[in-house]
Amino acid sequence: SFAESHAIPLYAVAVSSGPGSYTGLRIGLSTAKGVAYARNVPLIAVPTLQLITVGPLLYDDDMPDDALLVPMIDARRMEVYAAVYDRALHTVREVGADIVTADTYREWLDRAPVYFMGDGAEKCKAVIDHPNARFVDNVHPLARHMAPLAERAFLEGRFVDLAYFEPFYLKE
């Protein structure tokens, strides 16, 4: 293999675990499981919504310490899959399917600056008019942004069962 012929050590395989496209998650997970199994290394599942936050966290030097991050994936109509995290990526609110209205995120907007990002954030721009609302454009889950999340999971020993792990679809 390329990795073996170039003496590149492989200690684990990381994969985006969802939510997201059913087909995309299945293909990605099948590939990751195959590589992890063939190389006899552990599998790391990285939540897609956390993955979306990495770019803004790495490149926005002006983001205040008390900022909250709301990564979003467009579901359909006015629905998004979203979670709320603090800057350390601690979960403030678990992943859920939200109908976007002017009040959907008011609880957090009234407390701190809230950064909306991901392909679902465009829906919020049209309906949320709050001084703490910040919209980060053109943010997508990128493989290169998976590295810091996967490294943290690796160091903490957070691996998933290679045989039985399933993607998180949120909705079947």
Question: Where are the regions a protein language model picked out?
Answer:
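Surface "functional belts" at beta-alpha junctions
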Residues: P42-P141, Y169
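Catalytic-loop motifs flanking and including active-site residues across diverse enzymes
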Residues: I27-T31, T101, L142-M146
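N-terminal beta-alpha supersecondary unit
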Residues: S1-P19
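Short glycine-aspartate micro-motif
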Residues: A12-S16, G24, L68-M72
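DPxDG-like acidic metal-binding loop motif
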Residues: S16-T48
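Stable alpha-helical structural segments in soluble proteins, enriched in small hydrophobic residues
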Residues: F2-H6, A38, P56, M146-F154
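Acyltransferase
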Residues: R134-E172
